[in-house]
From Swiss-Prot:
Interacts with the NPXY motif of tyrosine-phosphorylated igf1r and insr via the PTB domain. Binds to phosphatidylinositol 3-kinase p85 subunit via the phosphorylated YXXM motifs. The modification Phosphoserine is found at residue 276. It comes from Xenopus tropicalis. Gene3D superfamilies: Pleckstrin-homology domain (PH domain)/Phosphotyrosine-binding domain (PTB). A motif (YXXM motif 4) lies at residues 411-414. This is Insulin receptor substrate 1. GO terms for cellular component: cytoplasm; intracellular membrane-bounded organelle; nucleus. A motif (YXXM motif 3) lies at residues 398-401. Coiled coil: none annotated. A motif (YXXM motif 5) lies at residues 430-433.
Length: 654
């Protein structure tokens, strides 16, 4: 009986049945323990005959705490590695007596265990211990911490200890706790980046909302006491007279990067500010109270995380509880200005160079002096890259399509009335589709009418599959001087404009071996001009022309034969000789010459000439009436084919 410290009736927490509890001190009869019997009578009988109904070894207990829940207001909870025990007293005074007695017995047990042969004590005593069920949410899921744990609150730490485990599974510093709260029977803790688990939340379920509220209040008190302890340490003695400027914790439209925030914060701290207001400390219940999900998201966005070596909570507690004076002002962000070779800087400006690979300055004839200096400076910078556009070029994506506007080198004129030839083609293998071709004004000066004469009819005119669709009528081209003609006299070749020389090969015509050449007409509308004057051709022959002005006089290979020639064919010559001597009013396209088939039959030169026709009529056998019919036939041919056609370089019947 000498080892009994205290005895009396208490109720068990779960069953709420009264039991007779006996608190024994460590000694020769056993270690410090808490025994309970069914009643006092059984205890007296068991003193000599039997043992207690239950025993709790206090040397294995790592927490003894006062609690209260919805049903029992005066609880004592003792936690061990394997389990625990909770008892309820009748009043607060009785609760305090048992609590103090258990702590004294534990202190005696620690004193005895300090001897070398004594067993090791399970570790430092915790201020508070709660049995919780960590839910698979947040860090409980990502760190695989779900299950039954003991949440142990020490002086500076908060640990999670599994059942039948000697060491805590996770130990969180109170300085790393950003906030905590409870909702119904759930209690959550949010930690920052400095925690061993990383940033996130831990959600724990307890018996009821009263226990959750008790956990909330107890941990907040520990955090508050810890923040008060850290308060004098956050201010250095050298800066005691200089208040620390704290930026406003409001939302910024464009938050700067962390590096710029740090630079601006140091620059403000170096400047002394007088009469700076000191923010009032905020209450703990306001910042760490339970909020709705919408309010929590707003609170998360409004908080500013500071990168201090102490911890996330240390910095947050300084801001929350006003541990250091500060000035609430709008931060001024000053980005650093590194040297030319200090960092690998990539400029994203609008006007800059496009790539690191640049041509030598000597090869760029069109580069201005300012740009040349920029290129020279750029070659000295190894790690510098400009991602913008070229500086001299300030186009907005607009391409002028008018004939008289200034054109760049890669501009292609699309108007048939443009007489000035474009710039020379610089890309190999490129075929200009413009009717004005690619003749360079620097290489060849064009005049109207041209000095070069090109004959119609080409032997290799069928080597190209290109068809000219541009009409040379007066309504679609600039009108040359009327006194000049494109087609020569009967003995000379046909003249073509000098702009034709810039066309692809399919527009050039080589001279025919025959002495006389004729130009065909494929225009749908034949216009009349002043009689007695030479006339320019109304269209170009469908047959191809030779290329002469493309770079390198490039000749395209023969066409595989996609082109299909559609032309009018005249009746056989035998039918014409046997039948009437009248020349049919048909024109056949052949090598760029228009022939009257009947006249071709009467005379071999293929021309409906008056003197030749008259000679053939004289040589014709028959009476004078037949010769008159032959002469009449020539006049009808003249009227049928039209004066425009017979006047375009062909000798008509006169």
């Amino acid at each position: 009986m000498e080892d009994i410290k205290k005895c009396g009736y208490l109720r068990k927490q779960k069953s709420m049945r009264k039991r007779y509890f006996v608190l024994r001190c460590p000694g020769t009869r056993g270690p410090a323990r808490l025994e309970y019997y069914e009643n006092e009578k059984k205890f007296r009988v068991a003193e000599g005959s039997g043992g207690p109904r239950g025993v709790l070894n206090l040397e294995e207990a790592f927490g003894v705490n006062k609690r209260s829940d919805a049903k029992k207001r005066h609880l004592l909870v003792i936690y061990t590695r394997d389990g625990g025990l909770g008892v309820s007293a009748d009043g607060e005074e009785e609760q305090d007596e048992w609590y103090q007695a258990i702590l004294e017995v534990q202190a005696q047990a620690r004193a005895l265990s300090s001897s070398p042969d004594a067993p090791a004590w399970p570790g430092p005593a915790f201020r508070e211990v709660w049995q919780v069920s960590v839910r698979p949410r947040g860090l409980g899921q990502t760190r695989n911490l779900s299950g039954i744990y003991r949440l142990c609150l020490a002086e500076r730490t908060l640990g999670l200890l599994r059942l039948r485990s000697e060491n805590p599974s996770v130990t969180l510093q109170l300085m790393n706790v950003r906030r905590c709260g409870h909702s119904d029977n759930y209690f959550f803790v949010e930690v920052g980046r400095s925690a061993v688990t990383g940033p996130g939340e831990l959600w724990m379920q307890v018996e009821d909302s009263v226990v959750a509220q008790n956990m909330h209040e107890t941990i907040l008190e520990a955090m508050k006491s810890l923040s008060e302890e850290f308060r004098p340490r956050t201010k250095s003695q050298s800066l005691s007279s200089t208040p620390i400027s704290v930026p406003s914790r409001r939302h910024h439209p464009n938050p700067p990067p962390p590096s710029q925030v740090g630079i601006s914060r140091r620059s403000r701290a170096e400047t002394p500010i007088e009469n700076s207001p000191v923010p009032k400390p905020h209450s703990l219940s306001k910042d760490y109270s339970v909020q709705s999900p919408e309010e929590e998201e707003e609170e998360k966005g409004a908080r500013v995380e500071t990168n201090e070596s102490s911890a996330d909570y240390g910095s947050a507690s300084s801001d929350e509880y006003g541990s250091s004076p500060g000035v609430l002002e709008a931060p001024v962000f000053l980005p650093p200005s590194p040297g030319p070779r200090e960092t690998n800087y990539i400029s994203m400006a609008l006007y800059g160079r496009r790539s690191l690979v640049m041509e030598p300055i000597s090869t760029n004839a069109n580069v201005p002096a300012e740009e040349g200096s920029r290129l020279t400076l750029f070659q000295e910078e190894d790690n510098y890259a400009m991602m913008g556009q070229r500086e001299p070029r300030q186009e907005t994506g607009y391409m002028p399509m008018l004939p008289g506007s200034n054109r760049s080198q890669d501009y292609m004129p699309m108007t048939p009335t443009s007489i000035s030839p474009p710039a020379p083609v610089e890309m190999a293998g490129y075929v200009m589709m413009s009717p004005l071709g690619s003749c360079s004004p620097e290489i060849e000066r064009l005049s109207w009418p041209p000095s070069q004469e090109v004959s119609a009819g080409s032997s290799d005119s069928h080597a190209s599959d290109y068809m000219n669709m541009w009409s040379l009528s007066r309504s679609a081209s600039s009108t040359p001087p009327p006194q000049e003609a494109f087609l020569s006299s009967p003995g000379g070749p046909c003249r073509v404009p000098a702009s034709y020389r810039s066309l692809p090969r399919s527009y050039k015509m080589e001279p025919q071996p025959s002495a006389r050449a004729s130009c065909s007409s494929s225009s749908d509308s034949l216009e009349e001009v002043n009689a007695g004057k030479n006339r320019r051709p109304l269209s170009i022959s469908i047959d191809s022309w030779n290329t002469g002005t493309l770079s390198g006089n490039y000749r395209r290979p023969p066409s595989p034969g996609e082109y299909v020639s559609i032309h009018f064919r005249a009746p056989p010559e035998e039918d014409l000789r046997e039948g009437s001597h009248r020349c049919p009013k048909r024109v056949r396209f052949h090598g760029g010459a228009a022939l009257g088939d009947a006249q071709r039959g009467l005379h071999g030169n293929g021309l409906c000439a008056s003197q030749n026709f008259t000679t053939s009529c004289k040589n014709e056998r028959g009476t004078g009436n037949e010769r008159g019919k032959c002469l009449q036939t020539c006049g009808e041919i003249t009227a049928g084919l039209g004066e425009d056609f017979l006047g375009e370089g062909l000798l008509g019947c006169r």
